[in-house]
Structures are given as structure tokens and as C-alpha cells.
Amino acid sequence: MAKIINFNDEARKKLEIGVNTLADAVKVTLGPRGRNVVLEKSYGAPLITNDGVTIAKEIELEDPFENMGAALVKEVAIKSNDVAGDGTTTATILAQAIVKEGLKMLSAGANPIFLKKGIELAAKEAIDVLKDKAKKIESNEEISQVASISAGDEEIGKLIAQAMAKVGETGVITVEEAKSLETTLETVEGMQFDKGYVSPYMVTDSERMTAELDNPLILLTDKKISSMKELLPLLEQTVQMSKPVLIVADDIEGEALTTLVINKLRGTLNVVAVKAPAFGDRRKAILEDIAILTGGEVISEEKGMKLEEATIQQLGKAKTVKVTKDLTVIVDGGGEQKDISARVNSIKAQIEETTSDYDKEKLQERLAKLSGGVAVIKVGAATEVEMKDKKLRIEDALNATRAAVEEGIVAGGGTILLDIIESMKDFNETGEIAMGIEIVKRALEAPIKQIAENCGLNGGVVLEKVRMSPKGFGFDAKNEKYVNMIECGIIDPAKVTRAAIQNSTSVASLLLTTEVVIANKKEEEKAPMGAGGMMPGMM
């Protein structure tokens, strides 16, 4: 396929148009007075959103060179979203500002390699200053403030803070669509998995159709149980101890199931059998998780173990187990805390190593069930369009909250970026490296100016007023006042700001050192052949 090649300023100008087109579409969403963007969908209703990365992902430009510029800034938003889960609009604005300032200097004859070095020096220093200024989250109220600012809704902020308080830092919080107008929070204690009793005759409460076992013994096996002979030695011991039993196996069928049900109905045995959750290797891993949580052992054929030789010591324990037709919940397992902690650390290491989003999600679920619990935020809305927008806001707020817990908080509303400029050390650099440092300093002013402009105010005037204000003061865009940002609860996660600075400077500095841009030449569509002429005399 033939290629089109652009060089020097011509190449960079085309890239800049793409950068500006995408950034201008995204930056209108910044701050509490930010606007929404409507995205056409190939099916269903349009999506109305103010989520930077969602908007960026939708943008494709017709001109291939401009599209490459847009794609580079799109990468900034996506990377920031992957690292911190929020701050994508800030990252996009910073990238646009660096490209704009940098291209001005290149047009004046600056060396792009030295400019890049200056940008990298300034970015590193900015991140070091940011880390020094970050304040550890100390209260549930601060978690609520971070979530409220990210979602643009105080009620959502409170809901997320409640969820974090219930499941802890390592617990999983999921977002689902509700069937009502209200947004609510549900929490699940203990380990829950999506498998219920294999027979309804095993219930202990026939009205609610649930089986509840107090202080049960828990038999775990990856084996399919079809013969009662395998279970008999172990069950005889549990009957002597008058203990209820939960059996978690690959499957329970045939004679074994019939005998268990008959003995349950006669009152000889208090037993509930459920199938093990998941499939294949994931099933084995979850069975091991349950074993560690309950202090038991998986009776595994792979390890050469036989069910008929299993002992009471190999069974797990729990305070209570509740089983419905499609759910099993184990509360207060009897496992050793050191074993559980070791398993948690092992799963965390696997999360760090995996590149698959699906595997990561499943590992996070296992981690939550072992260490904290699960909270579900059920999102209610009047229409599907509102539902999608609300869901995106809550997901962003959740990510921002986790980021704040991880690396602390800083003054919000772009105030920290001005603080960083003033606190940066003197680099003692001259020439084009100093110009690169100056590019970053000017770019860090862009977010606060944009927040003001989205309020209908002059960004330059607001910037100067903040500069003249006491330390820690910034622009409260919601109320259009100059206040102490942290005292008023206008805070941002340090991790989100760090990701925005890192990703914007990285991509923008690479764009500035671009000298040639190569794109595929579109093949012209051949015109369809016209209809053949008619023979003389034919109608």
C-alpha cells in the first residue's frame, strides 16, 4: 500500500490539530461546572457523559495525520485511567498545553531533544514535590469528600465512603444497575460463592428455603461423589460429635445424594451439599481459598488422597454457613490469620503480574472474599441514558477513592499544580533545557484556567487571584469563592495527579521530537461501470 509522508513543521502542525480537536472535546467536562458531551452509539440511545476517557475513546478523525495526533492524546487518557482510574481530563489538558508551548519553541528554532530533557527533568521534580505534599487519608469524611468531588454528587460520595468502611481497603466494591430509581448499597459478609444446595430437601427453613448451619464442619474435595461408601467413615465421626456438615464437592449424585437426603429427612444427619464454584484451575484455586479461610484441607485426587481415608482434622470450621438455592455464604472461618495473610499476599502478587483484565477481575474477587468482603452499589435512574452516565461517575469516584487511600490526598481544583510550580527547585539549567522546564511550569497552570473558563470566568484572572491568595487557598468553582481547599474538603488523590503529570509529559515530549509522520494512502474507489449501450432499434 502506498504511503503519504509529512516532514518537520508540516507533520507537527497536523498532529497538533488532532491533539487540539480531541483535547477541546474533553476539556469542557473539567470541574464542578464542566459540561456534558453527547456520544452517538451505533445502537441504542446516545450516551451523555462527562468522563474524559470515555469521550477520548470515541474520537476518530478523518485525516490520518490529525488522527495520529488525537490517538497520542487518547493514549494519555487511557494510561491515566489504567493507573489511577480518574484524572483523564486533567492529563489530556496538560498534554495539550505541553504540545502547544513546545511547538511554539520549536517554530522559534529550539532543539527538540534538549526541550524533551527539560520536560523530563521538570516532570520528575514535580512528582517528587507532589509526593512530599501528599497527606495520608485519616478519616471516612475525607474518603467521602474525594468520592463526592469525582462523582460530582455528595450522596454518591457518602455511599462510597460507607462501602469502603464496611469492606476495607482490600474489599471489592462492585457497581450494578438497580431495577428501581434509588441508588443503594448492599454488603456481603464472609466468603460468598454462586452455588447453592444440590437438593431442596436439605433446607433447614422451609418458608425461606434456606439452610443455616451453626459451627459446622466443612468437607472440601475436588472429587465427584457418587458412592456413600466413600463418605461413611467421616460422617459417622461427625454424627458422634453432633456437628452439622457442609460438603463442597465437584458434584454429589446417585446413591450418595439419595442417602444424604434420606438421612437428613430422618434427622440422622444435619448435612448440606453444594457444588464447588467455577471451573478448571479457577475451581481448584477457590477450593484452596476456602480451605485456608476455614482451616481445612482440600481432599484432592491429584494429591493421591482418598475420601474414605479423610479425618476430622482435615475438615474446615466456620461460625455459620448459610445456603440458598444459588448462593453459599461462609462467615467467620476457622483458618489461621497468618495463613490467610500469606494467601492474600500471593493473590496480590498474581494481580500485579497478570496482563489479562478478566483474570485481574477474578483475582480481585478472590482477594476480597478472603480479606474484606464484598459491597455492591446498585445504581438507580429514571432512564437508561442517565443510568449509564451515573454508573460511569460512580466507577470514576471509586477509582479516585482507592487512589486516595493508596497515595494520599492533595488540594484539589488545580491548586496543587500551582503549589508544585512554586515549590520546584532551581535547576541551574540554561538554554533549551531551561525552556523545556518552563514548558511544564506553564502547562501546570492550564487545569485551573480551564476550570475557571468552564464557569464562564476569565482563566487568567482566576489564576492570578489564586497566586495572590494565602498558601493552600484555591478557587472553589462550585461556589465561585477563594477558599482553603483542604479545609473545605476540595481534595484530589495524589495518585491521580501523579499519573496525569507522568503520562502527559511522556507522550507530549515524544510528540515534540517527531520529525516525520507516515500514513497509509487511501485507495480511490473505482467508479462503477455504467450500463452497456442498447442495440439500435431496441426500446
Swiss-Prot record:
Protein name as it appears in the record: Chaperonin GroEL
Reported function = Together with its co-chaperonin GroES, plays an essential role in assisting protein folding. The GroEL-GroES system forms a nano-cage that allows encapsulation of the non-native substrate proteins and provides a physical environment optimized to promote and accelerate protein folding.
Q: Which Pfam families does the record cross-reference, listed alphabetically?
A: Cpn60_TCP1
| Compartments it resides in | Cytoplasm
Which lineage ranks, top first, belong to the organism behind this chain?
Bacteria, Fusobacteriati, Fusobacteriota, Fusobacteriia, Fusobacteriales
The UniProt entry's sequence similarity note says:
Belongs to the chaperonin (HSP60) family.
Q: Which UniProt keywords apply?
A: ATP-binding, Chaperone, Cytoplasm, Isomerase, Nucleotide-binding
Q: What interactions and quaternary structure are annotated?
A: Forms a cylinder of 14 subunits composed of two heptameric rings stacked back-to-back. Interacts with the co-chaperonin GroES.
* Domain of life (superkingdom): Bacteria
Record SUPFAM superfamilies? GroEL apical domain-like (SSF52029), GroEL equatorial domain-like (SSF48592), GroEL-intermediate domain like (SSF54849)
